[in-house]
């Protein structure tokens, strides 16, 4: 009888057990993004596009995706008539008016937003 009471005292309550098991399974919540925040954007080349010397940039969270397109065009020294295709995580092609901070909230990985770029249609 004493042994049963001892075992009962050592057993954690169901809420404690649930907390421990769910903590390991839940993804880490993203950092709160404000309009003044800067986001780490990581550019990955694909489809024969030249790689950038500097692949990571800190960009304001409140800018449109068009600003990112313009920045990348400048880095690649592309003419206005040359095609450039950008995808988030190789899957999603945002519209130019999307806000970078919102894209980060939805698609960031390891505290950075990965943007794949190509001079030809590579995904989609």
Curated annotation (Swiss-Prot):
Specify the cross-link site (Glycyl lysine isopeptide (Gly-Lys) (interchain with K-187 in atg5)): 124
**UniProt GO cellular component terms:** Atg12-Atg5-Atg16 complex; autophagosome membrane; phagophore assembly site membrane
- Which gene underlies this protein? atg12
General function of this protein:
Ubiquitin-like protein involved in autophagy vesicles formation. Required for atg8 association to the vesicle membranes. Conjugated to atg5 through a ubiquitin-like conjugating system involving also atg7 as an E1-like activating enzyme is essential for its function.
- Which taxonomic lineage does the organism of this UniProt entry have? Eukaryota, Amoebozoa, Evosea, Eumycetozoa, Dictyostelia
Q: Which InterPro entries match?
A: Atg12 (IPR007242), Ubiquitin-like_domsf (IPR029071)
Bias class Low complexity marks the residues at: 13-28
Q: What protein name is recorded for this chain?
A: Ubiquitin-like protein atg12
Q: Which organism is it from?
A: Dictyostelium discoideum
Entry's Gene Ontology BP terms: autophagosome assembly; autophagosome maturation; autophagy of mitochondrion; glycophagy; phagocytosis; piecemeal microautophagy of the nucleus; pinocytosis; proteasome-mediated ubiquitin-dependent protein catabolic process
